[in-house]
Amino acid sequence: MAKHNELGKAGEDAAVKYLESKGYTIRHRNWRFMHWELDIVAYKDGEVRVIEVKTRSNDDFKEPIEAVNHQKRMRIMKATDAYIKYFNIDEPVFFDIITLVGSDGIFDIEHIKNAFNIRHYY
């Protein structure tokens, strides 16, 4: 596995542990529909959270959140629409971003709740 893929997997693993420690139930990881993917779908307090995970080894360059641009957000929303229909979801759905900076399983984690919403794009 390429180094950046290993870092991404370690970041997603750390994000899942973080979410579980905060009382979230993980419904799916890396859920795919056609060419779209949702990193993490979690549930807590009657809400579904679609969470995009961005991991970097350092913050010398672009901040991880900057990698979730308009085009990426549109793909996440389209994948979420498919997810909602496929699983017949009735609960409210929110879009979060978790950014991780670090390596070797040691990360600074930031959970940005309600990072974006559908109203901004339609």
Q: Residue ranges of each PLM-predicted region?
A:
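Acidic-basic catalytic patches of nuclease active cores, encompassing PD-(D/E)XK
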Residues: 1-29
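Short, glycine/acidic-enriched loop or turn micro-motifs at the edges of active sites
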Residues: 31-33, 55, 99
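Domain-level recognition of nuclease-like catalytic cores that cleave nucleotide substrates
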Residues: 86-122
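Short acidic/glycine-enriched loop/turn segments that link adjacent beta-strands
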Residues: 33-36, 105
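Acidic active-site catalytic centers that drive phospho-/nucleotidyl reactions
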Residues: 12, 37-39, 52, 72, ...
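Mid-chain, well-packed structural core segment of small domains
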Residues: 61-92
